[in-house]
Amino acid sequence: MNFDFKKIEIAYKKIKDSITKTPLVSNDYINNLLDAEVYFKLENLQNTGSFKLRGATHKISSLSSDVINNGVVAYSSGNHAQAVAYAALQKNISAKIIMPKNAPKIKIENTKEYG
């Protein structure tokens, strides 16, 4: 698989002002256990508590004005729902989030907080 670092740079420029720069940490115990240098990206510290915000923000930032004027729709029972709602709020775009009846109550409440 080839990575196009230009595309990664373009994506980063689109989202950098809308996301939290989360820390990258290492752990000596894990490193010794695996005999490797391992890093953890603490996306649980992201605005919505997960990495999903990066993708949702990038997608919403990439939409045409026609699509933006119509708003966005997402179906999710959790982190993606929160990410789309938050990203739409940040860009002042209408978002309709559909969640299953059995979605965790905390996820429903957190998503509603974003409008």
Question: What annotation goes with each model-predicted range?
Answer:
Residues 1-115:
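PLP-dependent amino-acid enzyme catalytic core
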